């Protein structure tokens, strides 16, 4: 299983680069961080023509946000929240590995700082 991850810093301004990465490297799964777009504005067909039919988008307007694009069907997938915040920083998905056993995938965006200098609060 080939997995790529990319802190993209705004998916909508890098659509051509995403398509080039998917075409040239052909990962089974692509994890994106800092997509900086609300779920409903995520590029609807991104990667579809290359077989990336399974997706979990956990975005928010202007900052943060993570996405998982996959050729492999999800057994289960859901957004997660941390530290009592509604920031879109974590997406979790499970896919079947080549041996048929589930593989858990956690896509995190972890900013360098936070509102207060406390790891438990951020």
Where are these regions (language model features)?
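Structured beta-strand-rich core segments of catalytic domains in phosphoester-bond hydrolases
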Residues: 34-117
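Short, intrinsically disordered, charge-balanced linker/junction segments flanking boundaries
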Residues: 118-122
